[in-house]
Amino acid sequence: DTHISEKIIDCNDIG
């Protein structure tokens, strides 16, 4: 679950 949350944050940063 932690990995998924971190991935979402990374995607938002790139966007």
From Swiss-Prot:
Keyword Glycoprotein carried by entry: yes
Keyword Glycoprotein: yes
GO BP field: defense response to Gram-negative bacterium; defense response to Gram-positive bacterium
Keywords: Antibiotic, Antimicrobial, Glycoprotein, Protease inhibitor, Thiol protease inhibitor
GO molecular function, one term: cysteine-type endopeptidase inhibitor activity
Top-level division of the source organism's lineage: Eukaryota
Post-translational modification: Glycosylated.
Note: Stable in the pH range 4.0-9.0 at 37 degrees Celsius. Stable when incubated in the temperature range 25-75 degrees Celsius and pH 7.5.
Function: Inhibits papain, ficin and bromelain with an IC(50) of 0.079 uM, 0.099 uM and 0.125 uM respectively. Has antibacterial activity against Gram-positive bacteria S.aureus and S.hemolyticus, and against the Gram-negative bacterium E.coli. Reduced antibacterial activity against Gram-positive bacterium B.subtilis. No antibacterial activity against the Gram-negative bacterium P.fluorescens.
Family: Belongs to the cystatin family.
Protein name from the UniProt record: Cystatin-2
Species in which this protein is naturally found: Capra hircus (Goat)
